[in-house]
UniProtKB/Swiss-Prot annotation:
Name this polypeptide is given: ADP,ATP carrier protein 5
Protein's cellular compartments: Cell membrane
InterPro entries, alphabetized: ADP_ATP_car_bac_type
Protein topology in the membrane: Multi-pass membrane protein
GO cellular component, as recorded: plasma membrane
Designated gene of the protein: tlcE
Span of the signal peptide: none
Amino acid sequence: MLSTSSRSFKNKFRAAFWPVHNYELGKFIPMSTLMFCILFNQNVLRILKDSILISEISAEIAGFAKVYCVTPAAALFVIIYAKMINYLTFEKIFYYLSAFFISFFVLFTFVIYPNIHIFHVHPNNLADWMERYPHFKWYISLVGNWGYIVYYSLAELWPNIFYVLLFWQFANELTTTEEAKRFYTLFSLFGNSSLILVGFLMMNLSSEDTIIKKFMSISDSKITLVQVSTTIVAIVAIICCLLVRFISKNVFTNPLFYAKAKSGRSTSERMGLIKSFKYIAKSKYLWLLLICSAAFGFAINLVEAVWKAKIKELYPTVNTYAEFNSLYILWTGVAIMVMTIIGNNIMRMHNWFVAAVISPVIIMVTGILFFVLIVFDQQILSLFDGAILMSPLALAVSIGGIQNILAKGTKYSIWDTSREMLYIPLDEELKTKGKAAVDVISAKVGKSSSGLVQSIIFTLVPTATFTLISPILMVVFTFVCLAWIYAVRKIYCEYQKIA
């Protein structure tokens, strides 16, 4: 009786905390490692792109870059990718895209950035033109600082291409719906633990007492930070390619891990490009998915834009900005891991809607609190006079950091894993080209729409700042979050029909 009770407890414990069978480790371990490496690079690039662009130019320029550079690049990529999957294997697509991105990052790091005065317009000339044409000053800055803008744009595309699209397409092809319920939250748990490693690593590399000083002399700390970080990114990218090769040759060919191994992976004739997009456009399911993904990008970018402007005021140099950003990434990793464990059990005990709606609700509540602090900062400080032991600027940065940690924590743990489950019941065309269109375009449409709102205001009112336009952004933010919650409810109804 005791033995039966003990066995029952063991089974329940395993189901809750380690629902992976021993024979599945050959599939689970390489996929978890691949996710870890992709997210490692993603977060190193995230720290670098913001630290470089915002410290070297300004926080306001980011919105313009997202609208006029990142979004067109994302749209172009979707068209190229839709063509590539008709002629190339997933493995080759992954190699070619990795080679392209890493080649530019290396070129920027070792050639363009150290000699930026050669490649960019002289700062004095740029300032003169911006002063002469104040309504177009941000567009002039985009062109004059093209090196920073291209680097920022490609680093912005990395997560949507390598993580959201390629990794999850790989995982969805390899994983059954039943396995997804057990694997996906653990993928998130192990993969997002990379944020903690990135946080500690980048805090050290960007600090004054960096370990780099023990191995080499440093003439320019910001150049050294970017060069060492990019070298690490290139090495990890090579490891990603080796993992994709291993999985393709050893997992996809094993009937134990992949049900289609005996008959081979799907080679059915695919639709042409125009027909494919027409097919996707008719899918209400994908349109709802697009709204959800775009809403997150739109909402979080409104909050982040104001927050990052405050960070630059507090940490004006590339290295100090990167050091703070690294601390934020570290705590985001901790939040994601905690929320992944919570989300895993929520997904088991409740339906898909309950798990999926957590993210927009938390983001809306914390975002509104942040905007209230920015808009009514003086009233709040006078109300709690003497009780707050930090400056208004430091308080705004701290509250914004907490908001972003909670928002990203729920999004990257609970929302991402629940969203990927929506693709599993779809047919092959919607799983590949449909996913590419939704995953790459939607996030960028969300961010660029947010950036468009900001860019219109800054173009019409050249003297505007993020602090001044915060009341407008707060209203828009609330509306977008409510639309996201509505779309989650509608897509749950559609999912129930086909799951």
